[in-house]
Swiss-Prot record:
Record key words, sorted: Ribonucleoprotein, Ribosomal protein, RNA-binding, rRNA-binding, tRNA-binding
Function of the protein: Located at the top of the head of the 30S subunit, it contacts several helices of the 16S rRNA. In the 70S ribosome it contacts the 23S rRNA (bridge B1a) and protein L5 of the 50S subunit (bridge B1b), connecting the 2 subunits; these bridges are implicated in subunit movement. Contacts the tRNAs in the A and P-sites.
Pfam family, one: Ribosomal_S13
The keyword RNA-binding is assigned to this record: yes
A GO term, aspect molecular function: rRNA binding
Protein name, UniProt field: Small ribosomal subunit protein uS13
Amino acid sequence: MARLAGVDIPNEKRIEIALTYIFGVGRTRAKETLAATGISPDIRVKDLTDEQLITLRDYLEANYKIEGDLRREIDADIRRKIQINCYQGQRHRKGLPVRGQRTKTNARTRKGPKRTVAGKKKATK
């Protein structure tokens, strides 16, 4: 397995798909990278030369934030929003959806499993 940006890239896949294993690189960015470096998107990772791997690594590191740097930046943005107490920060703090989604129903992924709340007791006569 080849390593790019600290990630093991699968040997049997086409390089266009294999690059998407790197956090911060999707299909579009993979295509742009391959076009800029002049590498065919149809070539398999196992068929890449060391020179091509070095070219890819250098291009990705020079032009994009990927893996650890990107994760740190995202975490810092969330921490900043929480600290300045903006609406999105409040939603992050409470563990609720941040971008205006409804919460009366759905939002179970963000809110976690249902917690049953006791209803009103029947009044005895």
